[in-house]
Amino acid sequence: MPTLLLGASIPFGTIAYTLFIFLLLLVMLRKFAWGPLMGIMKEREEHVANEIDAAERNNAEAKKLVEEQREMLKQSRVEAQELIERAKKQAVDQKDVIVAAAKEEAESIKASAVQEIQREKEQAIAALQEQVASLSVQIASKVIEKELKEEDQVKLIRDYIKEVGEAR
């Protein structure tokens, strides 16, 4: 009968056979299960690490894009403000040009009116001189026709003044 190990009643052959099967099972598990399982775990670990790296890169890129967008927005605001300032300046310049043109036109109209008034005045003076000359000739002819006394001269002058006043 085979010897017992440590006082147990299990034969040594059974223990050796069980140990052999167990070691064989460990070798087979290591070769067929543990190796591929560890490979899968390693791949999974690498995949997770790659995903984390990609997420960190994407996060950094997103932060960079956000900062670029902020800069672009800031620049757009500055450009918009400059555009508004240019438009205001252009409006003021245009206003000044319009006011200057209006003043110039008003001066032109005023000068034209002054010239027209001067021309009308000269025509009125010429007409008055013509009437005075005509009346002077008429008075002279009346004086020549009759010899005037002092009373007649006064009356003639008053009549002449009256005629000149009515002619106006």
UniProtKB/Swiss-Prot annotation:
Membrane topology: Single-pass membrane protein
GO CC terms: plasma membrane; proton-transporting ATP synthase complex
Cited Gene3D superfamilies: 6.10.250.1580
Presence of keyword Ion transport: yes
Short name of one Pfam family: ATP-synt_B
Subcellular location: Cell membrane
InterPro entries: ATP_synth_B-like_membr_sf, ATP_synth_b/b'su_bac/chlpt, ATP_synth_F0_bsu_bac, ATP_synthase_B_chain
Transmembrane regions listed in the UniProt entry: 9-29
GO molecular function, a single term: proton-transporting ATPase activity, rotational mechanism
Keyword terms of this UniProt record: ATP synthesis, Cell membrane, CF(0), Hydrogen ion transport, Ion transport, Membrane, Transmembrane, Transmembrane helix, Transport
Task performed by this protein: F(1)F(0) ATP synthase produces ATP from ADP in the presence of a proton or sodium gradient. F-type ATPases consist of two structural domains, F(1) containing the extramembraneous catalytic core and F(0) containing the membrane proton channel, linked together by a central stalk and a peripheral stalk. During catalysis, ATP synthesis in the catalytic domain of F(1) is coupled via a rotary mechanism of the central stalk subunits to proton translocation. Component of the F(0) channel, it forms part of the peripheral stalk, linking F(1) to F(0).
Subunit structure: F-type ATPases have 2 components, F(1) - the catalytic core - and F(0) - the membrane proton channel. F(1) has five subunits: alpha(3), beta(3), gamma(1), delta(1), epsilon(1). F(0) has three main subunits: a(1), b(2) and c(10-14). The alpha and beta chains form an alternating ring which encloses part of the gamma chain. F(1) is attached to F(0) by a central stalk formed by the gamma and epsilon chains, while a peripheral stalk is formed by the delta and b chains.
Family statement: Belongs to the ATPase B chain family.
Protein name: ATP synthase subunit b
Species per Swiss-Prot/TrEMBL record: Bacillus cereus (strain B4264)
